[in-house]
């Protein structure tokens, strides 16, 4: 699908024009104090190239973004104040923060912008219309967002982590303003097209995370494209149970056992399960780890990571791969005693990349794990900023925030 991109907008000229940018600044916070501390600024860093290009070209930049999932309107704990400060540091300039989304403060600040200024709106999800299922409500918010950049304004979609959402600042505003894919979104789509097009083989997929139900679509889609799919994380126990093995107190989706049995029967030559598990008697960082066979987890233990034998086996498989997609940790990597599986496979993927493989880390917890475990990001071909969006794309689903960018350009303005 052909879409207009940031280069097209810059070629048209943005000096003196208002440009609304939907960024993904949904970073994790460590709540040590009212404003919180950013523990992983990766998404902020990824948003900088598009914003810097617009600033340098003299645009009046208005940024919309969300943080967390506010339940009942504004929540001080989910204010974008720490994000504004961190973004300003990375851009090397002051970033204004509006105290509202499209209220009087946002309007006044937007009207007062000069060329090269950056205004960050307060958490877009503080306005319930952003995520409304009612088309009219979302469109009403989108019109107010468009008003912030005026009749000559433009919209740049650069929040790949939200393009699978049909939301006011992602989808509806693009129906009102001339729309362009930002640098990040364009790069993400190009990478995912490589995973679904003429992929170099062998093609290995590594899937972790807690629930089979979250990954069912991508397993079914990629099982016909990949040469092997490694299953780890909490969801591996439902697959082990489907083989008739005891999984002790491990996470188990009982309602998915039959589905896993069907997948194992259908894709017996593709799916790869752990041969051993690192287990403990409780879910805690100080729990004593025990390595047990994957087909005989004791009743009083729960699996919290894949074992060293599994890491060795999967490392050998990955060492021969030419293309690798990884989404989801292999265990509870936040607990050091149960991080070896995730770290081992991450290192194996990085080693394969060093030998010429094309590797993609599919965002979310996988990207956080890479950073938390101290593995250089340069060891991978691409680290995505959007876990859910990546998975839905690979499932073959339409992404509303991408689909709308392929539509004919409106004339601009909020009308």
UniProtKB/Swiss-Prot annotation:
Its main location: cytoplasm. SUPFAM superfamilies: Phosphoglycerate kinase (SSF53748). GO terms for biological process: gluconeogenesis; glycolytic process. It is an enzyme of class 2 (transferase). Its EC number is 2.7.2.3. Substrate binds at residues 24-26, 43, 66-69, 125, 165. Gene3D superfamilies: Phosphoglycerate kinase, N-terminal domain (3.40.50.1260). It comes from the Bacteria. PROSITE patterns: PGLYCERATE_KINASE. Pathway: Carbohydrate degradation; glycolysis; pyruvate from D-glyceraldehyde 3-phosphate: step 2/5. GO terms for molecular function: ADP binding; ATP binding; phosphoglycerate kinase activity. It is found in: Cytoplasm. GO terms for cellular component: cytosol. Monomer. Belongs to the phosphoglycerate kinase family. This is Phosphoglycerate kinase. It comes from Mycobacterium avium (strain 104). The gene is pgk.
């Amino acid at each position: 699908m052909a879409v207009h991109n940031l280069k097209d907008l810059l070629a048209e000229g943005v000096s003196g024009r208002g440009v609304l940018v939907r960024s993904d600044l949904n970073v994790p916070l460590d709540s040590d104090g009212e404003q919180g501390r950013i523990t992983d600024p990766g998404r902020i860093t990824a948003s900088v190239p598009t914003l810097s290009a617009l600033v340098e070209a003299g645009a009046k930049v208005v940024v919309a973004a969300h943080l967390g999932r506010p339940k009942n309107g504004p929540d001080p704990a989910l204010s974008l104040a720490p994000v504004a400060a961190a973004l300003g540091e990375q851009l090397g300039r002051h970033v204004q923060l509006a105290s509202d989304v499209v209220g009087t403060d946002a309007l006044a600040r937007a009207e007062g912008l000069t060329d090269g200024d950056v205004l960050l709106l307060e958490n877009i999800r503080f306005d319930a219309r952003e995520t409304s299922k009612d088309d009219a409500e979302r469109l009403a918010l989108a019109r107010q967002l468009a008003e912030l950049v005026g009749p000559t304004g433009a919209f740049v979609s650069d929040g790949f982590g939200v393009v699978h959402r049909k939301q006011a600042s992602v989808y509806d505003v693009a129906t009102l303003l001339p729309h362009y894919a930002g640098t990040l979104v364009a790069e993400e789509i190009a990478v995912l097209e490589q995973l679904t097009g003429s992929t170099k083989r062998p093609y290995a997929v590594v899937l972790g995370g807690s629930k089979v139900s979250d990954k069912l679509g991508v397993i079914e889609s990629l099982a016909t494209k990949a040469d092997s799919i490694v299953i780890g994380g909490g969801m591996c126990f439902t697959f082990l149970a489907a083989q008739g093995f005891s999984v002790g107190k491990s996470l188990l989706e009982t309602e998915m056992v039959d589905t896993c049995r069907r997948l194992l029967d259908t894709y017996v030559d593709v799916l790869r399960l752990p041969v051993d598990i690192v287990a403990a008697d409780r879910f805690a960082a100080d729990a004593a780890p025990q390595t047990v066979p994957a087909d005989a987890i004791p009743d009083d233990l729960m699996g919290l990571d894949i074992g060293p034998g599994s890491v060795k086996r999967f490392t050998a498989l990955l060492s021969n791969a030419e293309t690798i997609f990884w989404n989801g940790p292999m265990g509870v990597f936040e607990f050091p005693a149960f991080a070896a599986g995730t770290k081992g496979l991450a290192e194996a993927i990085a080693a394969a990349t060093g030998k010429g493989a094309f590797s993609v880390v599919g965002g979310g917890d996988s990207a956080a794990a890479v950073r938390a475990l101290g593995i250089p990001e340069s060891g991978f071909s691409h680290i995505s900023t959007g876990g859910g969006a990546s998975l839905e794309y690979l499932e073959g689903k339409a992404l509303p925030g991408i689909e709308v960018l392929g539509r004919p350009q409106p004339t601009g303005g909020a009308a």
